[in-house]
UniProtKB/Swiss-Prot annotation:
Name of the protein: WD repeat-containing protein 48 homolog
Similarity-based family: Belongs to the WD repeat WDR48 family.
Keyword annotations: Repeat, WD repeat
Compositional bias per record (Basic and acidic residues), positions renumbered to this chain: 504-513
WD repeats, residue ranges: 152-202, 208-246, 249-548, 560-599, 602-641, 645-683, 686-727, 794-833
Entry keyword annotation includes Repeat: yes
Keyword S-adenosyl-L-methionine: no
GO biological process: double-strand break repair via homologous recombination
Organism: Dictyostelium discoideum
Amino acid sequence: MYEYYSTGKIRSLPQQVDSNGINSKPMNSSPSTPIPNNNNNNNNNNNNNNNNNNNNNNNNNNNRNKSQQSFYLNNNNRNCGFSSPTKPQYNNNNNNNNNNNSNYNHSYGGGGGGTTSQFQQHHLHPVNRKPPKFKISYSVKNTLNNTIIPDRHCFGVNSLAYNHRKSILYSAGRDSTIKSYQIGGGDNDNDINEKNEYGFKFKKSFNDHTDWVNDLFFNDSNILVSCSSDSTIKIWNTDSERCVNSLKFHDDYVKVLAYAPKANYFASSGLDSHIKIWDLSICSISQSFSIDNNNNNNHNSSSNYNQFGDTSILKHITNNSQPTNKINNCNINVVNGNINISTNNNNNNSSSSNNNNNNNNNNNNGQTNTHENTAETSDSEGSKDDNQLSSVNKNGIRSNLSNNNFRNIDNIDEYTPPSSVLNHTPKILSSNGRNVNNRENNNNNNNNNNNNNNNNNNNNNNNNNNNNNNNNNINNNNHENNGNVDVDDEDDDDDDDDDDDDDCNKNKKKYDDNNNNNNYNNNNNKKNNSNDNNNDNNNLNKKFSPMFGSGSYLVGKSGGEGISIYSLAIAQDASFVVSGSTERAIRGWDVRSGQKIFKLKGHTDNIRSILLNDNSTRCLSASSDGTVRLWDIGEQRCIQVFDDLHTDSVWTLATNDSFSHFFSGGRDGMIFLTDLKTHQSRLVSRENEPILKILNNQDDQSIWVSTTSSTIKNYGLSNFYDKNQSIDNNTTNCGSISSEILYNNNNNNNNNNNNNNNNNNNNNNNNNNNREKLSTINEDSNGLQVDEPKIKIQGRAGIIKNQVLNNRRQVLTKDNDNNVQLWDITKGKEIESFGKVDFDKKLEEFNEVISIPKWFQVDCKTGSLFISLESPLCFSADAYQTNLGLTPTEDSLINIGESILYSLFSKWIMGYNLIQLNATTNKDNELNHSNDSVNSSLSSNTSGDNNNNNYNNYNNYNNNNNNGLQKSSSSSSIVSTNSTTPNSGRPLIEIMAKKSIFHLPSNTDVVISDETSGLVLYRSRIEEFTGREQIKIIDWLYNCLETSAIPIKRDNQKISFSVEVNEKIPQNLNAPYYIQVRKICDHVLNNFFINPNNNNNNNSSVNNDLPKGEEFFEICLQNKILLPHYTLGTVKSFFWKQNSTIPLTARVKAQYINETELVKYLKQLSLNHNKK
């Protein structure tokens, strides 16, 4: 992993794979291997610059170390999973002496001509990893009369992607889901989702995110990548319709993604100000893991994705031999805790003209033995050719992993938080056992080194035309002196402006030279290498940092602390990435060197969208300042400002493939189509909500539009423009409004001179005028036609307000259509919808006088109702069934959270119990050699009543897995409760029968997540549990289900009160909060009237058949009669909010005024009962 900051400096964050493949152990240097100092590093770099010809010619210099460097762990990047500072030693074993490496900073991530003085070592403190914190959530369905509302988005839709081959639209919603829709004719006519009037049908909902899905893109390999405010990036296989990887490396919301199709890399960024670049060919490797406890090699291929994700319950294992990665001109050898890195610097930024003369003569003499299973390369055997990649896919990326890299774990001790188990550390890359040195060496000799020579020999080998282009760009470094007003001259209050400008000036010439050289070389390669289909891809990957070889990623900060990145664009070959942020500036980063190469200033507010053309020479940016700017990347200046289109923030841009038109939309709800050649603009649509995303579909000349509402629209553009023509000015009633003068006459003349060799000749012709004109729509003009949408995908209302009622089982909600609904979370469904009524009045109407402790949390941020359970909070509420609206034959005390868990995992309990019984009977079968007895025991044990041998074994199993946490029986000085004590001898089915008070719908979604990492570990419906899911790692859940042990004691929440009877001295008592007033009446009846001299409060067995005390007595607090179902907690919360003892008074009801007769009657009843 690499990290670079606003200063342009780089540091390396190496990662270590332990014996089980987990990135959790520090990489300590070998005690016997000395660690080089920094002075030697500088000397080595100088020697490399001065004596590179000799180094290239001498391939026998195998023991020479290049620019060895000690690296230390970044404590801020805690998601790497390291626990202590690291000092890996980086050695070069002459594996990469093929190519000239002048001016190359051999520090990990170098390659941009930097020196070791630019490298910063960080001595940081250890990282303390937090233990996993599990959370169980379940959905409450928005159903009425058992009719499920169609699966549609609620709230806004942040992003869109389109599969042109299959005509499938993917939408990323603020409801945490990604939904796919078949547009027009599909490949599955038997789909249960019927098409509607617009000719589309719903296909699939991807639900693994837990917060807003902010962006997504789709590539040609049917891989969908999404990012979310839950700080994760998820890789989806749209063919199997499941998540194959979850990347949790951002520290905050991930807001934007950018994809480079030629390199198959993508960039991500967000509110943590980091830019990370990933190798999608490695990230998208399917990780289908088994959750079968009895078969670790069985991969679950269920479309419901019934598995603990790809990173949670499983650990990444490697072989005892440490892996060696060889990709993108880098060898990474992990041996005995040391990392040895040999980097081959195909430095495109080299300024020395004499360093590449002997490149074609340099080849490695060593041989590489690649083993399919171990992928281990011995240092003594040499390495592969420097230009070789490990197993090439269609994009030229090699990314084959060895088999059996993952397995299950069965207990919490082996669990490792998902952030450290990701498949983005140095991993086993192979070419399936084939030795590819010969072919790669030939390519290197014949073609690839020619490209290296062309890239490096700017002064000697480029033709005249290329030199002209270089001169054009080089002169732009000093365009301030030529009368041009550089955008960087605008005022900016950033503290790092001076450093940024210096860094940009240092790297600008290098970037411009390389950019032109790459264009020249690409043309050269087409002529010289037409017979080699893989050569272009190989050359493409040679210029990247060696991080991609290990499946790692690039990390950079844009603007320093407190800067949030909202927009991102990457060149199609991933050569550089551009970011826009709250810094109000556009920063460009060279992926090859990891350094900032330019900074474009001009916007006055947050930059919300950035687009690059195909050859990365032009850039469009949209900002919250209401403007759209067109930039020249080579000249690093703004060449046009579109400031008269929108009246508010511009949030999204879209363009066609030729970059001749662009669409813009924003907070004002207006969508404009602008011609970049003629600067003519036309209004396409006016929405009622702010525009979040515009997706241009050139296949049918339409655009997809999403807004802050939940509706997605498609507008046809056949009446607006031909994709091959400019906007028809004759049919567009536009008023010509002059734009702001960006440049004076001298500037325009200079611009024309400097842009002679650029690809935008039409733009240069327009610059002949003294000032550029921008034609925009006059909204009041006649003839303006705004078309109705061709397709409309309706959304649904989402919950925006909720209130948990006092009974802690019902929730009142209000959606964005102002509809008020009542939900019962113990039933898992909607009870009633009241329509558009006053929320507060309904709340007052349904909120009863009752107090039950909080035991769950409500999550409505995605528009749907989810209930979250965490330990020990979920076990905090005990209540009698009558207080929960139930009508049981016996009013027993239950723990609400425990009963909900039994309902959620009822299918798991049944399946797990049968598996355990089956395993036990199989053991008995081996001992008794009797198949008949086994069959009979299996049939009889289905109900869990027979086979003592099985139960004995089951007892031992439970005792071994019990953590010692037992459920406390509730007790007080008044009454003993019916609390269930755990009995490990009973099978789980028998326990479930008594504990399953609530019955949730079988289609209720159950989600298990780790709050520490923010990843979803498991998602399933109740009916889909099999009993093989490894929930043992959640100890509090497993103990609750198996032994009824909960990590909280009921007796620790007692309330003090006193009872005064017949104006006698009050009796001071205390009892748990859940004791009802009727229990106090029973206490008064028994202890003051029937057995006044009996001090033993445990008389319930004697007086069960006697009348209830509530028939004769009433309990009062300050002359207010308390209802029998009130609990002490209710009395304390509503009627006595002081911290002192509650003074209660017991009095005989009015119909029993003669207290003496009442006493005689009660005593007679007691005597008759005792005689019986």
